[in-house]
């Protein structure tokens, strides 16, 4: 990450990440396709209506894994083996504790949270059932995500891809067996998901355990070291809060979609799944930007750090434009995989119009905070993202949408919030970058004076 062609290394790092995300979404799409095709539109709406809510519950803790990624990348690049080992064991312990806590919270509060979202009576029972089963697998989900974050920190994005391929294939097969053969509906989809999460968890922990490097995992060493936990939290908690609060705005948006009935809900579920393919593609570039920035920051290569961001911008815009236009152009054909209901497809296409061709704005919005987190600055980007993204959407949902009730007006809030947030993040990045370069120059001058 710290030497050689940046673009080549970015692509080789980001491509497995991108494929991992696409695979995960493809297997999630199998959930939706199978339940939509063989259990009906109510079951499809039930599974889809939980997506934003599950993200709210989980993203705080997944965000904290970014702290482990940044800290691990910095220590690994600098050759600080003891600190790297302590980071690994602290992160895995945090993953286990947070996973167990999330399982209890999700099971206990699923029904109440869905009621607060205004989930229609005809789907809430199925939504609650799916959500409770899903949360039973949360310890496995958290352990996999934290383990994969550690592997990304050392530049390994290929093995997580292999693990997802194995677990996701299992998930797809189990979906077909449990839903079609045993007619378990949303329960079958939930059970298949939990089993696949358990498999991916076992594979990533085994990988860390078998390692002979500084990121080797030893279960006897699992404990939280306060100093490392604080450093992980300094980067991870703001990232997690940002993701959680943004998803809260998506919950509000889901509630607004719910007001149009189960047809619009099913359309949003299908569109949101396609929307996810765009997200994982640009997010892989953001994660690459964060990891590359962190390693170069750790060894003091600030000019290379600037070139990393430049190349990431080129890569992110190119990927998101190509995929966004492609998804919209071929949207009607792709959506028929999810459902054959013309009304559902029409709703989905109306949503995709405003969220696909403009998605490169979202990629740019995330890149600058990614670079800032790589330098250890996470709080201010979080605040700006919350103000720009969530603030805009809340004003839109409660101010503009009630006056012009349509799916089109509702989803214009996405590009509007992205553009406003980009402006604020660019200004923030300019000042932080200037401070980092100045501090580094002063430190170099002080060292030179002492040597003289």
PLM segments and residue spans:
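Helix-terminus/linker motif at the lipid-water interface of multi-pass membrane proteins
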Residues: 26-45, 114-121, 177-184, 244-277, ...
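Transmembrane alpha-helix boundary and packing residues in multipass membrane permease domains
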Residues: 17, 21, 33, 70, ...
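Short runs within selected transmembrane alpha-helices of multi-pass transporters and secretion channels
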Residues: 65, 134-152, 160-171, 189-204, ...
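Residue-level signal for short hydrophobic patches within transmembrane helices
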Residues: 3, 7-26, 30, 53-60, ...
